Amino acid sequence: MSSYNLPDDKGHFEQYGGIFTAETLMIAVTELKDAYAKFKDDEDFIREFEQDLKHYVGRETPLYHAQNLSKKLDGAQIYLKREDLNHTGAHKINNTIGQALLAKRMGKTRIIAETGAGQHGVATATVAARLGLECVVYMGEVDVARQALNVFRMKLLGATVIPVTLGSKTLKDSINEAMRDWVTNIDDTFYIIGTVVGPHPYPMMVRDFQSIIGKETKVQFAAQVGGLPDVLVACVGGGSNAIGLFHAFIDDASVEIYGVEAAGYGLEKGPTAHSAPLCAGSVGVLHGNRTYLMEDENGQIIEGHSISAGLDYPGVGPEHAYLKDSGRARYVAITDKEALEAFHVLTKVEGILPALESSHAVAYGIKLAKELGKDKHIIINLSGRGDKDIHTIAQIEGIEF
């Protein structure tokens, strides 16, 4: 039985999390909180969720021993949790399946979502198509340009994609616009947030749906190797793939946990050069919860940078903020250059194209493997596949199609 039982009933991970939202949104948030409390332990809901994960998403995903990479590094043994093999190509669908099933039970007919890299938008459009729900996706204009393939995928699936032209025109602004929509259309609309941010119950609910990653990993590692892994590594933007892997291991003190943020051009080059609030940010409130943020001395959000569209969110899930402060997890940062190098290494050595987000975790896993002995075992969460990033990488490397 796990001794870790956060958040509390108000959504707090000690000083982080909570519900910081406008009065106009409290009705919708309260309705969602009550519905999730009602259905999360309901046998029929759990059965349908698990069946969909198995037969529609394709779970369980493999835990793959990257023997070629391990041999090349001559260090620790590296295992990859292959979330890239899910339907739609990333971990995002674990969460959208759960929230869409909840929306149906709440009688909602319209789904809205925000997206950065486009993977959450695609995963939301996918489940909306399957369940016959109207779907609107808000996506920053900058992200629309750098993720054109995913925009087309969403439209093919029947979603309406609305480019957001306010602010930095990226993920933060997409969330703002989605929340405005939700306030205006509370009666028929369900907002599927794509990561472990937002007002309670979102950080808990998204974690719960993503925790299948760690639960599977624990069983798979015990079967393949025995015992527990030495180290877990996952990339952190909002942090849903990471908390999905970490959650099952939080009570296992022998397992070291590393979350990898985006150092962009380098942490030393200042706050606009990276997206690493846990490594170089401060505590504040954004999108309904208290957490670490990229903000200036006046409390204004700083627009950071990452090569990866899924890692340039200026905040992070409140549970990660708690895990950092408590010392249970360590948070580090990897530069664009290091992530790109790791992308090429994994592609050439194992024949697996990781997403640029996941490449940050791969890069740090490679660093650790070189430092640790051959008897150590590292699990890296390969949160998504890299098909969506081919154009970005080609552009950076001066390749034209």
Swiss-Prot record:
Any GO MF annotation of the entry = tryptophan synthase activity
Q: Which Pfam families match?
A: PALP (PF00291)
Q: What are the UniProt keywords, alphabetically?
A: Amino-acid biosynthesis, Aromatic amino acid biosynthesis, Lyase, Pyridoxal phosphate, Tryptophan biosynthesis
Question: SUPFAM superfamilies attached here?
Answer: Tryptophan synthase beta subunit-like PLP-dependent enzymes (SSF53686)
Protein name per its UniProtKB record: Tryptophan synthase beta chain
Top-level taxonomic group: Bacteria
Q: How does it assemble?
A: Tetramer of two alpha and two beta chains.
Cofactors per UniProt? pyridoxal 5'-phosphate
**Which positions bear N6-(pyridoxal phosphate)lysine?**
K92
The answer to whether the entry has keyword Lyase is: yes
Supply the source organism for this entry: Ruthia magnifica subsp. Calyptogena magnifica
In the record, the note on similarity to other proteins reads: Belongs to the TrpB family.
Q: In which pathway does it act?
A: Amino-acid biosynthesis; L-tryptophan biosynthesis; L-tryptophan from chorismate: step 5/5
